[in-house]
């Protein structure tokens, strides 16, 4: 699972989002509305880059890379190549037309000979940047299709002016026929309007544009198909359907498995090649075994092999360099079964990891003292490791928008019997913080100077600690009752799981145990996170939503659920209030200890819902508290936010690694640079990591 950067809610504007019904919570860093331009930098590194649409591009510094050994640098180089080879997979998973649309746009952008300063061409450039960022034509966070601001006539004429050989034409297809096929997908707002639809009462597959199910497959058919394939009494159940597309063939359902000689095979073959190149540079035999098992999984597509790989990966803890590469998180599938492809390469920040190790070493204490029913607690917490890492490269569904924390694997039985790894991505958190300073957000939305001072004093540490608690302990806590289907919460699994991990972190942030462990400086520190969390959940995350829309994304639903539930349940005692000052709405917290008790009660209920597989309970919580938006408050928040000129979403440009080789082809050094522009990086990736055909 992952945690994400929430929004301009705290001093660092880092707000984390937990993930879906998978427990791999990547702290998804949807660094929401945090910064525009960093005002004062303590170093000369340029953290902020260009801004377009609702997105601010950032850069992250790979601190310590130059001090690594040549072996470690070379390992990172080849693992990074493997991390970039799967880019086309995500585009295709997000929509069956995405690769063709991207290639049409790129060809016009690079080869167009007309007026490149015209309104239409500039609009095409902006649209292409958004397609690159979202790995498709739907918003990376809100899931809605974004509309081109250039005309169909302009695009058709431009496509006729470039070489037809560079266009994604079907065999025998004309340029006009290509336009007739693709333009409705791009320009008609009523066709494929949502990438992942979660609206209650609708067929979530037929109304979603994602490419995890073939044309004509219904939600009822898919649910029955996978229900029949589950072994009800299997103590080690595989994650059914994780790595395949479900299609209809001659009226019957069948899976197209993502593997070397199956669907996406041409991309997977290149991933395997680079994993093989990395293998000799592994630091331990355990890490070599991880790569061997991952390659075996990529070749066979066998999900039992995937569990074996996950087990080996959890046990491989002695290496400085680590990585994730594969089909991981299920946010993009409305049924929460099928995983998008993602990758990250990283190395441990040894000094910062001392913080997370204090939590993992005390995991049993936190489990024993949580406010949930003892029936839902783990009697013995196993194999929880936690570390702070430095990201070296981001790929797939972790790029350009990424996570600030990751907790894997997502398999419930592996987490229970083997354990899990939790990471907080320190250099990404640092980049968000550096870019967010001085953007005016706090002054606009935080109720008073005393609260702002509280946030400035404790906020950054609170954010890091909440991420650690969320990933390391929250996702790793609790257990399913025997016989509970791990997929029983369906579309509500992700927001419920993210809420569970967030609540675990919120509850324990206020505990004296953290002061005892030296993780918080005093008993007042937790209040900064409580305030920013409630402000974000009740108000400021709404800047990411278009007027009239509901909350769709799992992390946003989770935050709204927690904040609105606590607000409503504490209303009689005025625990939290929404007050007016000068015509503006603010969050006011009157009783922080009572708010903690409310978080504990909701944690107990959400753990019960998950442990028992209570679909009706999950549906009630999410639909009642996590979906609807107050239109008047929304209008006010949008107007106030617009004046700040802050982009509500953030993403990263990757560094560039160059291998220096001798006459025999041996790597003698690996250089890192941070100068590549967003356009140049995306065009290079489309050229050098062009791994899939137009239609898959």
Regions found by a protein language model. Give the residues of each.
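Extended, compositionally biased alpha-helical segments that mediate assembly or anchoring
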Residues: 591, 595-696
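Single conserved hydrophobic/aromatic residue that forms the stacking wall/gate
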Residues: 1-13
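Catalytic Zn2+-binding segment of zinc metalloproteases
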Residues: 472-484, 508, 512
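Post-HEXXH active-site segment of zinc metalloproteases
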Residues: 478-499
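An active-site-proximal "capping" alpha-helix that borders the catalytic cofactor pocket
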Residues: 69, 284, 494-511
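Long, well-structured alpha-helical subdomains associated
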Residues: 61, 506-609
